[in-house]
């Protein structure tokens, strides 16, 4: 392949709206171009990398017993009504109508369509288990698309679904898929962690996220050397042992217009750890009071999961006033009536705490659990914070890292099969719901994640198996007969052995060619100059070696042997 014949529009500078390294380098190297907010065109170089990532994933899916399928990009509303996700999915769901006014959505995920397929064709336990997977374009109307293909409105995803007769079989297969995802991450050259995660709108009883470690990652995770790991939304928080104090008489304190915990703490010279923060939420249209220690935040994902609520949001001021008889900022658990109270583990044993008094400009001092208030549920509903102890070993302090989620695996159970009536007959002729697993991986997101983790000041550093080309041959004067002859001979010998080779035949200065090779991230560069050829040599440089002083000289036949050895051809 000749550089001059390909569309590789490299740029010296990145666009001003490119916000992270991967976007800058993907645009500058000619991999992508922006069409509109959240929509990108994948150019030849980008597509070559994408196909190589696809093949890595496909090999692992096939090894796990998967069968590849293709689903439409447009799904009928009727299927989404069966699972109640037509409205629950929110504004991210692209909706459209055809000329007959029938409603559809652009595929954001494929649980409904694959369950519909299976319920039509799987009738007996003898047909189970089965796993289907596809590479398909997905659409999500992100409120603020950013970070290039990392969080776009259109993206390529591999989604897989497994179907089982019982939970035990799902558990066994989930481990198979967990291992497959681990292998994909290793083959892509990632430094990564698989961590426990919240299941979100997909649902199910348990899930893992596969997180690529990078400071630019949107997700925060916690981990411990004992092996525990979770994203911050899922991280378990322990009951806090707190010093017992003799309960003191409760006392109202006038705090003028001060209501923020930090301000009240300063006014009364108290630590926020002595406060009980009381927040009023609306869960499935009913108010609920939620309590957490003053130095913690409420984890809304944990809270919604605990309540089993379809929808949840903070109450508006009018609702807060009707529940507490006070404006926002003065709520407290003592005296609340006709409302469910949920207390975090951090407050249940807090002695002589300070709370709002349910009265404007007043707080209540020396509030104690069971004496002054009770809770309907005491559970872990707080966000993890630095300094918290690992919930698994209960010894070490949790460590925090940031990462990019590139894969997510779920144990769905019968969430979709029950709502869509996907059942089978067991060995005794009894009808049972099919048990499901779900396994997604963002293919275009993997490209960006690799670049975020593997780049330098000069450009991208691809691994050998993913690079758009494995070798670039740079003849400094392609018009010279001997240079051209040597270039084409090396090209033919390497190509015949299966290597992906690019000849940079452009009439450009050597410096421009070298900069583009480094920018694109081609692992090995062969430079052919008249000067070196006069001595029977060509130059070989590995992209990962960095500076040009890492250049090695070889005979033309020797450089072929060396590269075939490196690539094990």
UniProtKB/Swiss-Prot annotation:
Q: Name one GO cellular component term.
A: cytosol
Name where it mostly resides.
cytoplasm
| A UniProt-annotated Pfam family | tRNA_edit
Q: What is catalysed by this protein?
A: tRNA(Pro) + L-proline + ATP = L-prolyl-tRNA(Pro) + AMP + diphosphate
UniProt EC number: 6.1.1.15
Asked whether the keyword Cytoplasm is assigned, the reply is yes
Subcellular location per the Swiss-Prot or TrEMBL entry: Cytoplasm
Q: Which InterPro entries match?
A: aa-tRNA-synt_IIb, aa-tRNA-synth_II, aa-tRNA-synth_II/BPL/LPL, Anticodon-bd, Anticodon-bd_dom_sf, Pro-tRNA-ligase_IIa, Pro-tRNA-synth_IIa_bac-type, Pro-tRNA-Synthase_IIa_type1
Molecular function (GO) terms for this protein are: aminoacyl-tRNA deacylase activity; ATP binding; proline-tRNA ligase activity
Domain remarks in the Swiss-Prot or TrEMBL record:
Consists of three domains: the N-terminal catalytic domain, the editing domain and the C-terminal anticodon-binding domain.
The family assignment reads: Belongs to the class-II aminoacyl-tRNA synthetase family. ProS type 1 subfamily.
The entry's function note states:
Catalyzes the attachment of proline to tRNA(Pro) in a two-step reaction: proline is first activated by ATP to form Pro-AMP and then transferred to the acceptor end of tRNA(Pro). As ProRS can inadvertently accommodate and process non-cognate amino acids such as alanine and cysteine, to avoid such errors it has two additional distinct editing activities against alanine. One activity is designated as 'pretransfer' editing and involves the tRNA(Pro)-independent hydrolysis of activated Ala-AMP.
- What is said about its interaction partners and assembly? Homodimer.
Q: What is this protein called?
A: Proline--tRNA ligase
Naturally occurring in which organism (per UniProt): Endomicrobium trichonymphae
